[in-house]
């Protein structure tokens, strides 16, 4: 079996990031602004963008972010490799064929059906869901089913929860899992550009150290739990993510039992604090009952007493 058949990730250079999002701007200007920044960061980190070949809305913003920032890094990261792969169908391609922005995308894959388009996009290493409409929701549902049923190589899914956009969907997915209709999907939820960049950096390091795609997925599951710890450490000490990672790996590999327990407690505390912060934010935006938040807060207080 070849490395490609195993889903092995050989190098972090030019990791492919698939972004799914809306072809409209949405009512909140932050959707387009944040997704343009995401495109810029994809280029600056030397990643490649796989997306649905659109020049408008959220998707157009991501593409412009990449195109506006990749040339200054062409020699270092890209060489002759195009920074964007547009994946579309014949009908959609003909709508945009003469578009000034899209003509800058030198690699375009034209599939026969929307189904094949989705399958092609899922060849990326990382999948990001940005604010969008029913098309984005369709791709999110399709990707979850494909991965859980074994038709898709396991890989990290990032939810870019700009201004709480995905709160309702995340709650619905939790209800499905709790009701026994679906397995929980370990989405890496990021709320802003700092969290998104931290997740990208950690995934890049994890890909560099994993043997195959299944291990990358397991790492992503763990990252969903550990991410708040990295964010908190960055805020408290202004150190680089890579240094925090190295310190964590050192403790896990050769630290004493007390050090390991202290690290585990810090990670758990940061995770619970982030969950509570996110739940209060969700309540403010959706008006949901506070019972769940109260329960989480009680658990956190109990654990803090134990840690002391």
Where do the PLM segments sit?
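Glycine-rich beta-alpha loop segments
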Residues: 4-85
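Acidic/glycine-enriched connector segments
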Residues: 53-131, 135-136
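Glycine-rich, charge-decorated loop segments at or immediately adjacent to ligand/cofactor-binding or catalytic sites
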Residues: 56-64, 165-177
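Short, acidic/small-residue loops that bind anionic groups at enzyme active sites
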Residues: 77-79, 83-88, 130-131, 139, ...
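A charged, well-structured terminal subsegment
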Residues: 179-219
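Charged, low-complexity interaction regions
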Residues: 232-241, 254-260, 283-294
């Amino acid at each position: 079996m070849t490395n490609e058949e195993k889903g092995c990730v050989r190098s972090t250079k030019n990791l492919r990031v698939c972004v799914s999002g809306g072809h409209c701007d949405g009512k909140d200007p932050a959707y387009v602004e944040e997704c343009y920044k995401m495109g810029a960061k994809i280029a600056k980190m030397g990643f490649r963008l796989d997306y649905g070949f659109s020049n408008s809305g959220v998707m157009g913003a991501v593409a412009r972010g990449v195109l506006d920032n990749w040339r200054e890094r062409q020699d270092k990261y890209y060489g002759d490799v195009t920074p964007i792969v547009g994946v579309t169908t014949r009908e959609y391609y003909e709508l945009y064929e003469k578009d000034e922005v899209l003509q800058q995308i030198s690699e375009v894959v034209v599939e026969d059906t929307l189904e094949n388009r989705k399958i092609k996009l899922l060849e990326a290493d990382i999948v990001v869901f940005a604010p969008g409409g029913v098309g984005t929701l369709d791709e999110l549902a399709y990707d979850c089913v494909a991965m859980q049923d074994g038709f898709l190589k396991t890989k990290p899914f990032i939810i870019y929860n700009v201004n709480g956009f995905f709160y309702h969907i995340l709650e619905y997915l939790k209800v499905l899992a709790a009701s026994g209709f679906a397995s929980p999907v370990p989405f890496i939820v990021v709320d802003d550009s700092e969290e998104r960049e931290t997740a990208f950096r950690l995934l890049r390091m994890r890909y560099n150290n994993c043997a195959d795609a299944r291990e990358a997925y397991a790492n992503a599951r763990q990252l969903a739990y550990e991410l708040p710890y990295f964010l908190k450490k960055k805020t408290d000490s202004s150190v680089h993510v890579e240094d925090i990672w190295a310190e964590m790996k050192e403790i896990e590999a050769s630290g004493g039992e007390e050090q390991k327990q202290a690290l585990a407690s810090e990670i758990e505390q940061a995770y619970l604090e982030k969950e509570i912060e996110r739940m209060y934010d969700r309540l403010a935006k959706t008006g949901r009952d506070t019972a769940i938040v109260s329960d989480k807060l009680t658990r956190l207080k109990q654990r803090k007493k134990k840690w002391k």
